[in-house]
């Protein structure tokens, strides 16, 4: 069972390799975005609840393998495992089509700091317990690269192995443009109120 749409291709490949049936048990609401990108846990939890609907008849009484592209904070995975168990799944096994996310991304993907990354702070057993899953397994870094058919040097693997290919300033973050805009606006307001005198250099 894939978590749509991010797990569709990996779940299909998993089904073909193992000979297990592929079931689209979750129906996705395409008007809800990626939950891990939302600014608060409350919004993430709400998005996860309304994003997918389950077809219970495909799950009841079965041992289920759920496939997704990643586990970042664990919000989506936990909700999906619980959905499947509530629908009557006898067992739920989680398979992830990438290695564990161990490091934040400083190149534009909104991964939180390391303290908020599930795999960076918990053992596989702890993740399994948190998700209420019967097992959790990740694709290896080598396996992920092999699946692409491209050489490893074509990819940034920093979020998995901590090797950042381009230097970055950790003081800069995704809010840097907003901070700059706020400074410019405050200077503009001060000039408008004659609280600040412009000087020509």
What role is predicted for each listed range?
Residues 1-201:
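PRPP-associated nucleotide enzymes
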